[in-house]
Design a protein with these regions (language model features):
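Extracytoplasmic gate region of multi-pass secondary transporters
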Residues: 71-134, 186, 190, 220-221
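A late C-terminal transmembrane helix in Major Facilitator Superfamily
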Residues: 194-233
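Symmetry-related core transmembrane helices of the 12-TM Major Facilitator Superfamily/SLC fold
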Residues: 13-32, 238-253
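Small-residue (Gly/Pro/Ala) motifs that create kinks and tight helix-helix packing interfaces
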Residues: 1-3, 26, 30, 101, ...
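Helix-to-loop junctions at the C-terminal end of transmembrane segments
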Residues: 129-142, 228
């Protein structure tokens, strides 16, 4: 890091400060900004406060008549399908996040701050794409085609990246396409469990989906490293990740969802 030694601090200490301070600031803001109950949230419209209060009351009434255990979630095919889909998505998320700097370093020969700036380019476009996709999904009330479509576009980006070699501009375009689409999956994906499970079943389902899915954070990068070592290049690993996104699209497209109202 270029900040290594600045103000007597090592590079890793600056890294911890850069990652930790925003979280501390967000925690203080949250303490004063968030409320204990929906009816106290002045930043919500009266209609939104009323809807949320009624939904919470309905969930409490459902919980009074019984609860869904984690064991019941283990027996749910829907939960396992969603867990598998989330596993595939998380595999790509962490693989690209952890390996992209190395891929661009090998292709460009850049290091330090210049490499960091180069690596951020795809994620700048990703921020805008996530907002656009999420808003469009909310406006239309459509969920699974947004997830499946983003997965397929992300797969195309990875396939293009696998064939880009050391062409830095083409790599940037490929990963921008991949991340803009693939990262947009997650906000819409988490609207699916409540549609399929509902009530208290959603809580146990969320826990299992999140637990199983996050294993992809280990499996994906490890697979990339193993294939890089055995093949000598990044292409095979990216093609495997692309195939995973195609499978994700097929899994989500096969789900039968209730119709949701556009916002």
């Amino acid at each position: 890091m270029e900040l290594d030694g600045a103000l007597g601090l090592h590079g890793w200490q600056w890294l911890f400060l850069g990652e930790g301070l925003p979280a501390v600031i967000a925690g203080v803001v949250t303490l004063f900004y968030l409320t204990d109950r929906p009816e106290q949230a002045e930043w919500l419209s009266p209609e939104a406060r009323g809807w949320l209060t009624n939904e919470m009351a309905r969930d409490r009434a459902a919980a009074a008549h019984g609860h869904v255990t984690l064991g019941a979630s283990f027996r749910s095919a829907r939960v396992w399908l969603l867990s598998f889909a989330y596993f595939l998505n998380t595999s790509v998320t962490y693989s690209v996040f952890l390996w992209l700097p190395r891929i661009l370093e090998d292709a460009s020969g850049l290091r330090g701050v210049r490499l960091g700036l180069l690596t951020t380019i795809p994620f700048v476009f990703t921020l805008a794409a996530m907002v656009i996709v999420g808003r469009h999904s909310d406006r239309t009330g459509e969920r699974k085609l947004h997830v499946a479509g983003c997965a397929l576009v992300g797969a195309c980006g990875l396939a293009l990246a696998s064939a880009s070699g050391s062409n830095v501009p083409l790599l940037l375009v490929s990963f921008t396409l991949c991340q803009s689409a693939q990262r947009s999956i997650q906000p819409v994906f988490w609207t699916l469990p409540p549609l399929l499970l509902g009530g208290t079943a959603a809580a146990a389902g969320f826990a299992l989906i999140n637990a199983v899915g996050n294993l992809g954070g280990y499996a994906g990068p490890s697979m990339m490293g193993w294939l890089k070592e055995t093949s000598g290049g990044y292409g095979p690993g990216m093609l495997v990740l692309a195939g995973g996104l195609v499978v994700l699209a097929a899994v989500v497209a096969s789900l039968r969802l209730p119709q949701t109202r556009p916002n």
